[in-house]
Swiss-Prot record:
Keyword flag Protein biosynthesis: yes
Family (UniProt): Belongs to the RRF family.
Job of this protein: Responsible for the release of ribosomes from messenger RNA at the termination of protein biosynthesis. May increase the efficiency of translation by recycling ribosomes from one round of translation to another.
GO CC annotations, alphabetized: cytosol
Protein name according to UniProt: Ribosome-recycling factor
Record-linked HAMAP family: RRF
Keyword Protein biosynthesis (UniProt): yes
Length: 188
């Protein structure tokens, strides 16, 4: 019979923190009315015979609130970078200026804002589910440890309460991040 270790709650807290961080990263790729360098993080460019992230072939900066500039390091890659940005589903139209691409960020329509808010809500729900799954894993480990007499019943209940507190805290942070992102999206 395999021995059961005493469950360590910090590993579950770390996993929940990673779920919240992943949500914030996903939110970064959602287009709002303002320019953000992270908007282009998901774009891959066909470069040197393979698909590479845009950040590996160019420097992305935000000189103005509604403008992103992409400084391509290799002059021969400008066309590929422009093509990748145009083909992305972000609806952006870069303007080529030598080795620099200027990408004006058009204002969002009300309909598009609502769609983005729904997408943000979907991302948040995915992470809430992930946090709940982590809670389930933690509680299963606690039950197994109690069953194998590694921890007492009282300790199991105390730790389950702690796991629930961690879950509530993580979901609260997810909800706060969603609220902030929705406000950012709906801001005209």
């Amino acid at each position: 019979m395999a021995t059961t270790e005493k469950p360590v709650l910090s590993k579950y807290r770390d996993r929940m923190d990673k779920a919240v961080a992943a949500l914030k990263e996903e939110f970064g790729s959602l287009r709002t009315g303002r320019a953000s360098a992270s908007l282009l993080d998901q774009i891959h460019v066909d470069a040197y015979g393979s698909s590479m992230p845009l950040t590996q072939v160019a420097a992305v900066s935000v000189p103005e609130p509604r403008m992103i500039t992409v400084n391509v390091w290799d002059r021969g890659m400008v066309v590929s970078v422009e093509k990748a940005i145009r083909q992305s589903d972000l609806g952006l139209n870069p303007v080529v200026d030598g080795q620099t691409l200027r990408i004006p960020i058009p204002p969002l329509t009300e309909e598009r804002r609502k769609d983005l808010a729904k997408i943000a809500g979907r991302y948040a729900e995915q992470q809430r589910v992930a946090v709940r799954n982590i809670r389930r894993d933690a509680n299963e480990d606690l039950r197994k440890a109690q069953k194998d007499n590694v921890i007492s019943q009282d300790e199991e209940k105390r730790m389950e309460t702690e796991v629930q507190k961690m879950t509530d805290e993580a979901i609260k942070r997810i909800d706060e991040a969603l609220k902030t992102k929705e406000q950012e999206i709906m801001q005209v």
